[in-house]
Amino acid sequence: MKIIFFLCSFLFFIINTQCVTHESYQELVKKLEALEDAVLTGYSLFQKEKMVLNEEEITTKGASAQSGASAQSGASAQSGASAQSGTSGPSGPSGTSPSSRSNTLPRSNTSSGASPPADASDSDAKSYADLKHRVRNYLFTIKQLKYPESLDLPNHMLTLCDNIHGFKYLIDGYEEINELLYKLNFYFSLLRAKLNDVCANDYCQIPFNLKIRANELDVLKKLVFGYRKPLDNIKDNVGKMEDYIKKNKTTIANINELIEGSKKTIDQNKNADNEEGKKKI
């Protein structure tokens, strides 16, 4: 009886362990597939071809904003003048309609004026609305993944997308974009290594696109474990510092040569001035 009870408890433990492992395996695969799609979409969106914002749209929006402000100030001045003329002179329909027409005509011209078409040769330039829609949809998808530290950077990028000048800074600088793609790629590599550890010894089947091949194992280790060993990193940093110092030495030498040359020129000019002064005396 005790043996049967022991066997039942042992079987229950094995089944429960397999269920937990299967659930974690399924979650890992789902996360990895979503991350893989996000990484590929990000690279095709930002790095396959450079985003080019229509420059004429930026200048047109800036000009329309300035003309709108001047139109409002002109309208307020004209309405004040018409109010004064209405109080001093006779009131009538002819005293109000010209001012109202003069107030409405400039506004209609500035607001209804369409932006000029983009240059036909600049075929890569896209409108702000189109690029903003694509980038915002991608950032909202990233936020739904809920990977570690997945809120601050996408929220910051979404804030930049709200303004055309901030959006131009975002796509021209590429600092935030590169940081986001790096984090996504790093997290994908980390979960991929975890999945291969979970499915070690053929315990579970790894999807073909998520398997770690022998030729990429070293690269993945460098990526996950901090780009090689700390000693190699220190050697690289020392080499970079030496190159930096050498460049600075050459720069300092060139600056000293310029200083010496300028001193000689100043001394020669002083001597020439002194000789001319002596001749005049």
From Swiss-Prot:
<keyword id="KW-0732">Signal</keyword>
<keyword id="KW-0325">Glycoprotein</keyword>
<feature type="glycosylation site" description="N-linked (GlcNAc...) asparagine">
    <location>
        <position position="109"/>
    </location>
</feature>
<feature type="compositionally biased region" description="Polar residues">
    <location>
        <begin position="101"/>
        <end position="110"/>
    </location>
</feature>
<feature type="signal peptide">
    <location>
        <begin position="1"/>
        <end position="19"/>
    </location>
</feature>
<feature type="glycosylation site" description="N-linked (GlcNAc...) asparagine">
    <location>
        <position position="248"/>
    </location>
</feature>
<comment type="subunit">
    <text>Forms a complex composed of subunits p83, p30, p38, and p42 which remain non-covalently associated; the complex is formed at the merozoite surface prior to egress from host erythrocytes. Forms a complex composed of processed MSP1 subunits, MSP6 subunit p36 and MSP7; the complex is formed at the merozoite surface prior to egress from host erythrocytes. Within the complex, interacts (via subunit p38) with MSP6 subunit p36 and (via subunits p83, p30 and p38) with MSP7 (via subunit p22). Forms a complex composed of MSP1, MSP6, DBLMSP1 and DBLMSP2.</text>
</comment>
<feature type="compositionally biased region" description="Low complexity">
    <location>
        <begin position="63"/>
        <end position="100"/>
    </location>
</feature>
<keyword id="KW-0245">EGF-like domain</keyword>
<feature type="compositionally biased region" description="Low complexity">
    <location>
        <begin position="111"/>
        <end position="120"/>
    </location>
</feature>
<keyword id="KW-1003">Cell membrane</keyword>
<dbReference type="GO" id="GO:0005886">
    <property type="term" value="C:plasma membrane"/>
</dbReference>
<keyword id="KW-0964">Secreted</keyword>
<keyword id="KW-0336">GPI-anchor</keyword>
<comment type="function">
    <text>During the asexual blood stage, involved in merozoite egress from host erythrocytes possibly via its interaction with the host cytoskeleton protein spectrin resulting in the destabilization of the host cytoskeleton and thus leading to erythrocyte cell membrane rupture. Involved in the binding to host erythrocytes and is required for host erythrocyte invasion.</text>
</comment>
<keyword id="KW-0472">Membrane</keyword>
<protein>
    <recommendedName>
        <fullName>Merozoite surface protein 1</fullName>
    </recommendedName>
</protein>
<keyword id="KW-0461">Malaria</keyword>
<dbReference type="GO" id="GO:0005576">
    <property type="term" value="C:extracellular region"/>
</dbReference>
<keyword id="KW-0677">Repeat</keyword>
<keyword id="KW-0477">Merozoite</keyword>
<keyword id="KW-0449">Lipoprotein</keyword>
<feature type="region of interest" description="Disordered">
    <location>
        <begin position="63"/>
        <end position="126"/>
    </location>
</feature>
<dbReference type="GO" id="GO:0098552">
    <property type="term" value="C:side of membrane"/>
</dbReference>
